[in-house]
Amino acid sequence: MERLLITLILVCTMNNITNAQNPFYGQYHTPHETVPFDRIETEHYEPAILEGIKLQNAEIEAIIQNPEKADFTNTIEAFEESGKLLDKVVAVFGNMLSAETNDDLQELAQKIMPLLSEHSNNITLNEKLFARVKEVYNQKETLQLTQEQKQLLEN
């Protein structure tokens, strides 16, 4: 039992060290939060993408499990705010893949692109999420939305 506990503590500690060293976690701490390309390694992408998928899945689940009536804030805005980490990592990965590709990035793309497609499909085809969005959309004339909110709802 003691050995198991020590192993678990070591794994958690190593995970925290790895997370602390991955520039995708947290703020970049660069002028204007520009991407610190000099600190990003190929091995940073996959764990950050997997964590981003996990976080967005939890965010989507929170939206669809919300017991309150669907409204602009708890559905549309919440959906818009979901997936920030994933968006951040995928944007950098996509740009690097097209601008400075190499065999390692292409191999990683072969591995993660199906995961990203599946994740996207799971969101866009989620019937419970669609029902909440539709409920808000059907009220759009009575919601007194700003132009920006209307555009967000339409898209």
Give the residues covered by each predicted segment.
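N-terminal helix-rich structural modules
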Residues: Q21-N155
